[in-house]
Amino acid sequence: MTATRTLPAPALEHVCDLEVSVSAPIDAGVLMGLGTQGRRRIIPITGGSVTGRIQGRVLPGGADFQRVPNDTTADLDARYLIALEGDYAGEHVFVMNRALRRATPEDVQRLLKGEPVDPDRVYFRCAPVFEVSTPQLQWLTENIFVGAGARAPNGVSISFYMLK
């Protein structure tokens, strides 16, 4: 190669918005391995709604398996099932959503107490991967998606975008 070429920046296309209901966190204790890796926290998912290009309900039974390495950061690994409605009624989408949430220690404490925190004060970004039950939704498995989220006292709001 002789010269570096700058490629066009990817664009984002909004796909859907989720309102996910959760119940109280389960503290699973300190993680051990190659030194202390932080704490494990499990957040049960109790339901929710999906609006946008795909529509449906977040079914109860999923969970967010969090690794909390310090007072400011949580590595999230949420897995849950969406029952689709509208054009795809009867079909399902399985979501595996990896995320990073970072805030000041004070804002993290407020979130843990169930107090509201301005979403602009919290870095909450995700990269969902989907499994689908119908060929008409295969585009969900053939593209890269990113998202932004906000934690509320009883749930999470997430917007998913497809990289173009």
Protein language model annotation of sequence segments:
Residues M1-K164:
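Beta-strand-enriched cores of mature, soluble protein domains
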